[in-house]
Amino acid sequence: MLKPIKGVRCYRCSRPLLEERQEFCYDCSRKKHVYQQGIAVFGYQSPVAQSLYQLKYHARKEYGIFYGHYAAVYAKKQIQAWKIEVLIPVPLHPSRLAKRGYNQAEVIARAMGEKLNLPVVTDAVKRVEKTKPLKELNPQERRKSLQRAFMPAKNQAHWKNVLILSLIHISE
């Protein structure tokens, strides 16, 4: 059975906290992130981990649609409070996209956009460097690997509030 994360969460990364008066988790209290705020719907354990693996590597897009619809309902109030204008799925490197045939983050983003009546923009950011799978890297290697992996596309609109969608938040 799927159980969404509930209770007190870190203001920055959405990780569950032990004490109500805490605002930030240990990691977020000592490290600066490149994003202002995040929200996680589920913890990364079975059956979530298994279904995301199936979505990513076995074209089980129905899982992405389910997670997108669920996330839209679960996070609707927060997304409205943030005044999100567009959803931007984290892009894959062109070679990975060609191999997989689709971007799993885009599947989730499109399902969310459908429920929230928000546009999904897939050409705002480009993946310019192919990186190793992040799960194989330590925190310092992840940060270094991603520093030059993305570039904003030219001539893009200037939105104030965007929601960048990724399947997994890898904590440091």
Residue ranges of predicted features:
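Glycine-rich phosphate/pyrophosphate-handling loop used in enzymes and phosphotransfer proteins
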Residues: 1-171
